[in-house]
Amino acid sequence: MLTNSSLTVYHKVEIDHDYKWARYFYKNIWWFGGKGSSTNKGYDNANDVQIRIPYDLNPDLDYNNFGIGDILVQGEHKDITSEQDIQGEYYNITSLNNNVFGNNRHIHIGGK
């Protein structure tokens, strides 16, 4: 699988009736999409991102480290305590698929 970027994921974890953001970094990912406009759909679909994270290029990849609503930031970023700590553009996971069949095993993420 071709890769063109890296990704930081902030996964929301509940601990003792409180939430914390667990940070996961993946060096080899395929990123497509981003902020912009479309002549047909306006800002609706133009803000979507599609991300594929190959298992063979990310040895610590675990499907359980992702959830709907988690935060996606392109590139490598530091730990956070809240969403307000994020500098720049970020997306939330809206769809999540674990594609483990065939020769091209990967996690496919949709974000908005």
Residue ranges, per PLM feature:
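Active-site-proximal polar cores
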Residues: 1-26
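Short, conserved turn/kink motifs that form compact alpha/beta structural patches or helix kinks used as
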Residues: 20-112
